[in-house]
Each structure stands twice: as C-alpha cells, then as structure tokens.
Amino acid sequence: MDRSAEFGRWKAQSLSKADLSRKGSVDEDAVEVVELLNSREEFFTTSSCAGRILLLDGSTEGSGVQKQHCCWLLVTHKPCARDDVMAALKGATSEAVLKFEPFILHVQCRTLQDAQTLHSVAIDSGFRNSGITVGKRGKTMLAVRGTHGLEVPLTHKGKLMVTEEYIEFLLTIANQKMEENKRRIGRFYNYLQHALKRETISNSHSKIKERNNPLCTHKNRRSQGKAQGPSTTEDNGRELEDGDGLEISAALFLGDD
C-alpha cells in the first residue's frame, strides 16, 4: 500500500475512535493545537494532556478515581488552592504525592521530515524533552514533552509529614509552573502556525519552479524513473529516511509500533 494512503487510513481509524481518557474530551488549553494538527494532511494526534496538578495516594483503598495501584485524590487542569489539597489529603491512607505534570502531546506524522518540522517547533517553544520515534512498520511518532514537572511526597502510611505552610509553598510553585506551561502551549501554537505556513509557501514555490523549468521537470522524471526501478524497495526508502533523521535530529529513537 502507498505510504500516503496507509497514513490516511491510520488517521481515519484513530480519529474515529472514542476518547478513552478519564475526562472524555481534549483539555481546553490544548484544543487549538490539537484541532490545528488534525486539520492537516500530514499529522494527527493520538493523545494529549494540557498539564495538571494531581494528588495521588499509593493505596487503592478509599475514595477517588483509581488507576493501576494508586488512587487519584485530586486532579485539576487549573491553579490549585491549599484548602483543596488539605481536603483531598483526608482520603490518604498510604503514600500521598503531590505532582505537577506538564503538557504532553503525541502526534503521528506522515513522514520523518514532517516530524522534524514539528520537533523543531516543540524545542523552540520550550518543550526540551521532545523526541521522535520511528517504528518497524514505518509509523513516525513525535512526543512533545516538557521538563518542568514537580513531584513531592506529603504523607507516609497516611500520616501527613509536612506542614500546611509547606503545602501552600509547593502549590505556589506548582501554580507558577502551570502558568508557564500555558504560555509554552501558546508559543507552540503560534510557532506551529508560522512553520506550517512556511512549509505551504515553500512547497508551492517548488511546484511552480518545477512547472516553469522544463530541464528541472525532465531531471525529476528521470529521477522518478530510477527510483521506481526494481532495485528500490519500500524498506530501502525507509532506511534512507531513517538515515536523514539520524543526521538532523538528535532526539530520534527506533522502536516498535
């Protein structure tokens, strides 16, 4: 199957699936970014979180939304107050941890070059832990990740180990990180718009130049004829694509689909 057609099939399948996240919808601060990417032929998003402050308990007992071996006592995508945390801590029976998790976004890209464009946008926006993964089946994934997280234990065996004053101090830091996270998402959206506009203009100019230059058109046709010969396979194309990525992007990983 043609690579572009296969990517289109993957995209249609992914976007038709129900949202299985706890919230069941895209976070408000990430909506514009997600909609912009999904409106383009070369991208689609597979998961996202705009950033959140949460309080997790290491026990699966008590109230809250349970996930794996911990209990979610509190989760918010907005700035958090001390009273909210203190009330939630009453449900802690084990090792309660206060966390801030920054924006994360997973995007499947049509080509490695598309992923590299998006990777540059992410790095320039402040998401320095972003990286590209190329799977064995040719799926190219870009993870947009930040490094400005926070994780602090508050209780041990259900007993509060810090003062309320310290919790208020931690929330001040977490809320500041939340605001900075929101600014970075805004930068990412703006930079992404400019990058996609440049790509569109560049592609348009290349097509016009090719149409107006008979010699260029003749050379391209000869190149295409060679590329379609029996010695060229899809696997060879992937190897060439992978090689380009290793030269250009340091954050490239090979893995399973």
Curated annotation (Swiss-Prot):
Q: Which GO BP terms, alphabetically?
A: methylation; tRNA processing
Q: Which reaction does it catalyse?
A: 4-demethyl-7-[(3S)-3-amino-3-carboxypropyl]wyosine(37) in tRNA(Phe) + S-adenosyl-L-methionine = 7-[(3S)-3-amino-3-carboxypropyl]wyosine(37) in tRNA(Phe) + S-adenosyl-L-homocysteine + H(+)
Write out the ranges of the annotated region (Disordered): 202-244
* InterPro entries with a match to the protein in the record: tRNA_yW-synthesising, tRNA_yW-synthesising-like_sf
- The record's top EC class is transferase
Key words of the record: Methyltransferase, Phosphoprotein, S-adenosyl-L-methionine, Transferase, tRNA processing
Q: Does the keyword tRNA processing apply?
A: yes
Instruction: Please indicate if the UniProt record lists RNA-binding as a keyword.
Output: no
The Gene Ontology terms for molecular function here are: methyltransferase activity
What Enzyme Commission number(s) appear in the record? 2.1.1.282
Query: Pathway it belongs to?
Result: tRNA modification; wybutosine-tRNA(Phe) biosynthesis
PTM Phosphoserine: list the residues: 25
Give one Pfam hit by family name. Answer: TYW3
Residue ranges under compositional bias (Polar residues)? 225-234
Q: What does this protein do?
A: Probable S-adenosyl-L-methionine-dependent methyltransferase that acts as a component of the wybutosine biosynthesis pathway. Wybutosine is a hyper modified guanosine with a tricyclic base found at the 3'-position adjacent to the anticodon of eukaryotic phenylalanine tRNA.
Q: Which family does it belong to?
A: Belongs to the TYW3 family.
Name under which the protein is recorded:
tRNA wybutosine-synthesizing protein 3 homolog
Which species is this record about? Mus musculus
Lineage, top ranks:
Eukaryota, Metazoa, Chordata, Craniata, Vertebrata
Gene responsible for this protein: Tyw3
